[in-house]
């Protein structure tokens, strides 16, 4: 299913400000998605027109549980800019 590629929306103060000021929505998605795939995914799932896409991969953080160490799962963070007057309800 296509919705499985979207992990969750990012809910930080910075993402809320950009959502209301610039119509930019921030999501964490699967690492394997490319920008054209991300655009098609959001346009079909939410019925919006995506004007711009910015992506980056934040560094993985080290996690320690007892004596063993590991890393948190990697993800890709996406900032979507929508056409004026449109919004995503989540």
Curated annotation (Swiss-Prot):
Entry-linked InterPro entries: Nucleotide-bd_a/b_plait_sf, Ribosomal_uL23-like, Ribosomal_uL23/eL15/eS24_sf
CC terms in the record's Gene Ontology section: chloroplast; ribonucleoprotein complex; ribosome
Main location: plastid
One Pfam family in the UniProt entry: Ribosomal_L23
Matches recorded under SUPFAM superfamilies: Ribosomal proteins S24e, L23 and L15e
Subunit structure: Part of the 50S ribosomal subunit.
HAMAP family: Ribosomal_uL23_B
Protein name in the entry: Large ribosomal subunit protein uL23c
Protein species of origin: Tetradesmus obliquus
């Amino acid at each position: 299913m296509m919705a499985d590629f979207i992990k969750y929306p990012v809910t930080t103060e910075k993402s809320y400000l950009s959502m209301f000021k610039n119509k930019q929505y921030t999501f964490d998605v699967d690492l394997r998605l490319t920008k054209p795939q991300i655009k098609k995914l959001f346009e079909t799932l939410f019925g919006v027109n995506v004007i711009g896409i910015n992506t980056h991969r934040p560094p993985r953080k080290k996690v320690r549980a007892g004596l063993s160490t590991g890393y948190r799962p990697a993800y890709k963070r996406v900032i979507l800019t929508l056409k004026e007057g449109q919004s995503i309800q989540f």
